[in-house]
Protein backbone atom coordinates (compact mmCIF):
# COMPACT_ATOMS: atom_id res chain seq x y z
CA UNK A 1 0.00 0.00 0.00
CA UNK A 2 2.86 2.36 0.77
CA UNK A 3 4.25 1.79 -2.72
CA UNK A 4 0.86 2.49 -4.27
CA UNK A 5 0.51 5.74 -2.37
CA UNK A 6 3.95 6.77 -3.54
CA UNK A 7 2.91 6.35 -7.17
CA UNK A 8 -0.23 8.48 -6.90
CA UNK A 9 1.59 11.72 -7.85
CA UNK A 10 2.60 10.04 -11.13
CA UNK A 11 -0.98 9.13 -11.94
CA UNK A 12 -2.15 12.65 -11.11
CA UNK A 13 0.50 13.97 -13.54
CA UNK A 14 2.49 16.90 -12.17
CA UNK A 15 1.74 19.15 -15.13
CA UNK A 16 0.96 22.72 -16.05
CA UNK A 17 -2.54 22.17 -14.69
CA UNK A 18 -1.14 21.37 -11.26
CA UNK A 19 1.09 24.43 -11.32
CA UNK A 20 -1.77 26.72 -12.32
CA UNK A 21 -3.87 25.29 -9.51
CA UNK A 22 -1.40 26.69 -6.97
CA UNK A 23 -1.74 30.27 -8.19
CA UNK A 24 -3.93 32.80 -6.52
CA UNK A 25 -3.48 31.37 -3.04
CA UNK A 26 -1.29 34.20 -1.80
CA UNK A 27 0.65 37.21 -2.95
CA UNK A 28 2.37 37.53 -6.33
CA UNK A 29 5.88 38.94 -6.72
CA UNK A 30 7.20 39.97 -10.14
CA UNK A 31 10.74 39.90 -11.53
CA UNK A 32 12.13 41.28 -14.78
CA UNK A 33 15.74 41.28 -16.01
CA UNK A 34 14.96 44.58 -17.77
CA UNK A 35 13.74 46.30 -14.59
CA UNK A 36 15.58 49.20 -13.03
CA UNK A 37 16.86 49.36 -9.48
CA UNK A 38 14.44 50.14 -6.68
CA UNK A 39 11.57 47.89 -7.73
CA UNK A 40 9.08 46.72 -5.13
CA UNK A 41 8.07 43.42 -6.72
CA UNK A 42 4.74 44.61 -8.10
CA UNK A 43 3.69 44.03 -11.70
CA UNK A 44 4.34 47.71 -12.44
CA UNK A 45 7.69 47.93 -10.60
CA UNK A 46 9.18 44.42 -10.67
CA UNK A 47 12.34 43.36 -8.93
CA UNK A 48 15.44 43.10 -11.09
CA UNK A 49 16.69 39.83 -9.59
CA UNK A 50 14.94 36.67 -8.50
CA UNK A 51 16.60 36.59 -5.07
CA UNK A 52 14.82 39.77 -3.99
CA UNK A 53 11.46 38.12 -4.55
CA UNK A 54 12.64 34.78 -3.16
CA UNK A 55 13.57 36.41 0.13
CA UNK A 56 10.04 37.74 0.65
CA UNK A 57 7.81 34.99 -0.75
CA UNK A 58 5.98 32.94 1.88
CA UNK A 59 3.66 29.93 1.85
CA UNK A 60 1.04 30.34 -0.88
CA UNK A 61 2.94 33.10 -2.71
CA UNK A 62 4.08 32.94 -6.35
CA UNK A 63 7.18 34.52 -7.89
CA UNK A 64 6.53 35.37 -11.56
CA UNK A 65 9.70 35.75 -13.63
CA UNK A 66 9.52 37.62 -16.95
CA UNK A 67 11.23 35.97 -19.91
CA UNK A 68 14.93 36.75 -20.28
CA UNK A 69 18.39 35.71 -19.10
CA UNK A 70 19.17 35.62 -15.37
CA UNK A 71 22.61 34.95 -13.92
CA UNK A 72 21.95 33.23 -10.61
CA UNK A 73 24.19 31.78 -7.91
CA UNK A 74 23.12 30.30 -4.59
CA UNK A 75 19.55 31.57 -4.81
CA UNK A 76 17.90 30.69 -1.50
CA UNK A 77 14.19 31.18 -0.75
CA UNK A 78 13.63 32.95 2.54
CA UNK A 79 10.70 30.81 3.64
CA UNK A 80 9.32 27.32 3.30
CA UNK A 81 5.82 26.66 2.07
CA UNK A 82 3.38 24.28 3.69
CA UNK A 83 1.41 21.29 2.46
CA UNK A 84 -0.98 22.56 -0.22
CA UNK A 85 0.51 26.08 0.00
CA UNK A 86 3.78 25.98 -1.87
CA UNK A 87 6.19 28.85 -2.45
CA UNK A 88 6.08 28.81 -6.27
CA UNK A 89 8.66 30.06 -8.79
CA UNK A 90 7.52 30.10 -12.42
CA UNK A 91 7.77 32.13 -15.65
CA UNK A 92 5.28 34.92 -16.18
CA UNK A 93 2.95 33.57 -18.90
CA UNK A 94 3.27 35.17 -22.31
CA UNK A 95 6.72 36.72 -21.74
CA UNK A 96 8.95 34.07 -23.28
CA UNK A 97 11.58 31.65 -22.05
CA UNK A 98 13.26 32.21 -18.69
CA UNK A 99 16.91 31.13 -19.00
CA UNK A 100 18.88 30.68 -15.79
CA UNK A 101 22.67 30.54 -15.86
CA UNK A 102 25.39 30.15 -13.26
CA UNK A 103 28.12 32.87 -13.39
CA UNK A 104 30.75 30.18 -14.12
CA UNK A 105 33.64 32.30 -12.89
CA UNK A 106 36.08 29.63 -11.67
CA UNK A 107 36.36 25.84 -11.93
CA UNK A 108 36.33 25.63 -8.11
CA UNK A 109 33.14 27.67 -7.76
CA UNK A 110 30.89 24.81 -6.67
CA UNK A 111 27.75 26.71 -5.68
CA UNK A 112 24.22 25.64 -6.55
CA UNK A 113 22.07 27.80 -8.81
CA UNK A 114 18.84 27.25 -6.84
CA UNK A 115 19.47 26.09 -3.27
CA UNK A 116 16.36 24.55 -1.72
CA UNK A 117 18.35 22.76 0.98
CA UNK A 118 16.54 22.43 4.28
CA UNK A 119 13.34 23.92 2.88
CA UNK A 120 9.87 22.44 2.60
CA UNK A 121 7.20 22.75 -0.10
CA UNK A 122 8.94 24.96 -2.65
CA UNK A 123 7.85 24.47 -6.28
CA UNK A 124 10.20 25.36 -9.13
CA UNK A 125 8.54 25.05 -12.52
CA UNK A 126 9.10 25.93 -16.16
CA UNK A 127 12.64 27.39 -16.18
CA UNK A 128 15.50 26.61 -18.57
CA UNK A 129 18.96 25.99 -17.11
CA UNK A 130 21.45 26.29 -19.95
CA UNK A 131 25.16 26.58 -20.79
CA UNK A 132 27.13 26.53 -17.56
CA UNK A 133 30.01 24.28 -16.52
CA UNK A 134 31.18 24.79 -12.97
CA UNK A 135 28.12 24.99 -10.73
CA UNK A 136 27.76 22.45 -7.95
CA UNK A 137 24.34 21.66 -9.38
CA UNK A 138 21.36 23.40 -10.94
CA UNK A 139 19.06 22.57 -8.00
CA UNK A 140 20.18 21.41 -4.56
CA UNK A 141 17.61 19.72 -2.31
CA UNK A 142 19.81 18.63 0.55
CA UNK A 143 17.55 17.77 3.47
CA UNK A 144 14.52 19.20 1.66
CA UNK A 145 11.00 17.90 2.10
CA UNK A 146 7.99 18.07 -0.22
CA UNK A 147 9.69 20.25 -2.86
CA UNK A 148 8.92 19.95 -6.59
CA UNK A 149 10.98 20.58 -9.73
CA UNK A 150 8.74 20.26 -12.79
CA UNK A 151 8.62 21.14 -16.48
CA UNK A 152 12.15 22.56 -16.49
CA UNK A 153 14.80 22.13 -19.18
CA UNK A 154 18.43 21.39 -18.34
CA UNK A 155 20.67 21.83 -21.40
CA UNK A 156 24.44 21.74 -22.05
CA UNK A 157 25.57 21.58 -18.44
CA UNK A 158 28.72 20.26 -16.76
CA UNK A 159 32.46 19.89 -17.35
CA UNK A 160 34.50 16.66 -17.47
CA UNK A 161 37.27 18.03 -15.22
CA UNK A 162 35.00 18.93 -12.28
CA UNK A 163 35.67 16.07 -9.86
CA UNK A 164 34.22 17.24 -6.54
CA UNK A 165 32.17 14.40 -4.99
CA UNK A 166 29.11 16.64 -4.50
CA UNK A 167 29.30 18.41 -7.87
CA UNK A 168 28.40 15.49 -10.11
CA UNK A 169 24.68 15.92 -10.76
CA UNK A 170 22.25 18.45 -12.20
CA UNK A 171 19.74 17.89 -9.38
CA UNK A 172 21.00 16.74 -5.99
CA UNK A 173 18.71 15.19 -3.36
CA UNK A 174 20.76 14.34 -0.28
CA UNK A 175 18.94 12.96 2.77
CA UNK A 176 15.75 14.41 1.31
CA UNK A 177 12.18 13.20 1.81
CA UNK A 178 9.02 13.35 -0.28
CA UNK A 179 10.36 15.54 -3.10
CA UNK A 180 9.35 15.23 -6.77
CA UNK A 181 11.38 15.72 -9.96
CA UNK A 182 8.83 15.31 -12.75
CA UNK A 183 8.21 16.22 -16.39
CA UNK A 184 11.68 17.69 -16.97
CA UNK A 185 14.05 17.49 -19.95
CA UNK A 186 17.79 16.79 -19.56
CA UNK A 187 19.89 17.17 -22.73
CA UNK A 188 23.64 17.20 -23.41
CA UNK A 189 24.73 16.73 -19.81
CA UNK A 190 28.28 15.99 -18.60
CA UNK A 191 28.01 13.96 -15.41
CA UNK A 192 24.85 12.79 -13.64
CA UNK A 193 21.25 13.91 -14.04
CA UNK A 194 19.40 13.30 -10.76
CA UNK A 195 21.08 11.98 -7.60
CA UNK A 196 19.11 10.46 -4.72
CA UNK A 197 21.75 9.96 -2.07
CA UNK A 198 21.85 9.46 1.69
CA UNK A 199 20.66 7.23 4.49
CA UNK A 200 17.59 9.39 5.17
CA UNK A 201 16.36 9.63 1.56
CA UNK A 202 12.79 8.35 1.53
CA UNK A 203 9.66 8.75 -0.56
CA UNK A 204 11.18 10.85 -3.36
CA UNK A 205 9.75 10.63 -6.88
CA UNK A 206 11.68 10.91 -10.17
CA UNK A 207 9.15 10.45 -12.97
CA UNK A 208 8.22 11.34 -16.55
CA UNK A 209 11.58 12.94 -17.31
CA UNK A 210 13.58 12.53 -20.52
CA UNK A 211 17.36 12.11 -20.59
CA UNK A 212 19.29 12.54 -23.85
CA UNK A 213 23.02 12.54 -24.71
CA UNK A 214 24.95 12.19 -21.47
CA UNK A 215 28.74 11.91 -21.20
CA UNK A 216 31.15 11.29 -18.34
CA UNK A 217 33.06 13.48 -15.91
CA UNK A 218 35.76 12.72 -13.38
CA UNK A 219 35.13 11.60 -9.81
CA UNK A 220 37.37 12.62 -6.91
CA UNK A 221 38.21 8.94 -6.39
CA UNK A 222 38.34 7.84 -10.02
CA UNK A 223 41.61 9.16 -11.43
CA UNK A 224 41.32 9.96 -15.12
CA UNK A 225 38.21 7.81 -15.64
CA UNK A 226 34.92 9.48 -16.60
CA UNK A 227 31.53 8.52 -15.14
CA UNK A 228 27.90 9.34 -15.87
CA UNK A 229 24.47 8.13 -14.72
CA UNK A 230 21.16 9.72 -15.63
CA UNK A 231 19.63 8.71 -12.29
CA UNK A 232 21.92 7.77 -9.42
CA UNK A 233 20.38 6.05 -6.37
CA UNK A 234 22.59 5.01 -3.46
CA UNK A 235 23.52 4.97 0.24
CA UNK A 236 20.12 4.66 1.90
CA UNK A 237 18.75 2.51 4.69
CA UNK A 238 15.06 3.38 4.17
CA UNK A 239 14.70 3.54 0.39
CA UNK A 240 11.15 3.50 -0.97
CA UNK A 241 11.99 6.16 -3.52
CA UNK A 242 10.27 5.78 -6.91
CA UNK A 243 11.85 6.06 -10.37
CA UNK A 244 9.08 5.71 -12.93
CA UNK A 245 8.02 6.45 -16.51
CA UNK A 246 11.35 8.07 -17.46
CA UNK A 247 12.77 7.88 -21.00
CA UNK A 248 16.47 7.57 -21.87
CA UNK A 249 18.19 7.82 -25.24
CA UNK A 250 21.86 7.98 -26.30
CA UNK A 251 23.24 7.71 -22.77
CA UNK A 252 25.85 5.29 -21.36
CA UNK A 253 24.06 4.42 -18.10
CA UNK A 254 20.38 5.08 -17.41
CA UNK A 255 19.84 4.08 -13.77
CA UNK A 256 22.57 3.24 -11.26
CA UNK A 257 21.62 1.43 -8.04
CA UNK A 258 24.53 1.36 -5.60
CA UNK A 259 24.82 0.50 -1.89
CA UNK A 260 21.22 -0.28 -0.89
CA UNK A 261 19.88 1.20 -4.12
CA UNK A 262 17.80 -1.94 -4.60
CA UNK A 263 15.53 -0.88 -1.72
CA UNK A 264 13.68 1.43 -4.13
CA UNK A 265 10.88 1.18 -6.71
CA UNK A 266 11.51 1.16 -10.47
CA UNK A 267 8.49 1.15 -12.78
CA UNK A 268 8.03 1.37 -16.56
CA UNK A 269 11.19 3.24 -17.46
CA UNK A 270 12.20 2.99 -21.14
CA UNK A 271 15.54 3.23 -22.93
CA UNK A 272 16.66 3.47 -26.57
CA UNK A 273 20.22 3.38 -27.95
CA UNK A 274 21.78 3.20 -24.49
CA UNK A 275 24.68 1.06 -23.23
CA UNK A 276 23.45 0.08 -19.75
CA UNK A 277 19.83 0.29 -18.67
CA UNK A 278 19.97 -0.60 -14.97
CA UNK A 279 23.25 -1.23 -13.12
CA UNK A 280 23.05 -2.74 -9.64
Task: Indicate where each model-derived feature is located.
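Bacterial N-terminal signal peptides that target proteins for export
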Residues: 1-11
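Bacterial N-terminal signal peptides
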Residues: 9-20
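Boundary at the C-terminal end of the N-terminal hydrophobic targeting segment
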Residues: 21-26
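Acidic Gly/Asp/Thr-rich repetitive segments characteristic of extracellular carbohydrate-active
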Residues: 31-71, 76
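Residues on the solvent-exposed faces and adjacent turns
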Residues: 33, 67, 79, 91-93, ...
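Right-handed parallel beta-helix/beta-spiral solenoid domain characteristic of secreted/periplasmic
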Residues: 45-46, 64-67, 80-135, 156-162
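Extracellular beta-strand/beta-solenoid scaffold signature
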Residues: 76-77, 84, 103-115, 133-141, ...
Amino acid sequence: MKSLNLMKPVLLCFSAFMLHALEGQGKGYYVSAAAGDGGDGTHVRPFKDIQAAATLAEAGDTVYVTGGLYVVEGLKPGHSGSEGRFVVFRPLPGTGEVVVRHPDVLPGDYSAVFDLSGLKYVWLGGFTFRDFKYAKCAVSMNGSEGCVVSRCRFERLGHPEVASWNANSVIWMGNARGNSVVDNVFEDIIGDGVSINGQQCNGNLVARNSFTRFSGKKRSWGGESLFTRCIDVQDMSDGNNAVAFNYFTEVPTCIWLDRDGSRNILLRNRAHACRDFIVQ
